[in-house]
Amino acid sequence: MLCAVYKSIRKSQTYLFIAKRDDFSSVPEPLLAQFGPPQLVSLLNITLQTKFAMAEAEKVLSAVKNNGYYLQLPPPPVNHLQEHKDWKKKRQENKNEI
């Protein structure tokens, strides 16, 4: 399936996949308002074998076919402080077991 991929200029690492270039008729108006002016990134021929860094091709294809669009959001931010605290706690627990 050929898809047009747009990036948001307002929201970093946020992408919108649609079936037809410049046809945003199936994208809800509130979403487009938050997304901002879409900036075309690429036209992709997506198959089930297509590899994405942050999405599964099957989910992208299904969403575009059923909803008319797929919205890829950035990953949640990593809380390095919490990870460090968890690591220290686990390390302390392991020392206490010995």
From Swiss-Prot:
InterPro entries (alphabetical): YcgL-like_sf, YcgL_dom
Chain positions covered by the region annotation Disordered: 75-98
PROSITE patterns reported for this sequence: YCGL
Record-given protein name: YcgL domain-containing protein Ping_1076
Domain of life from the UniProt record: Bacteria
Domain named YcgL: residues: 1-85
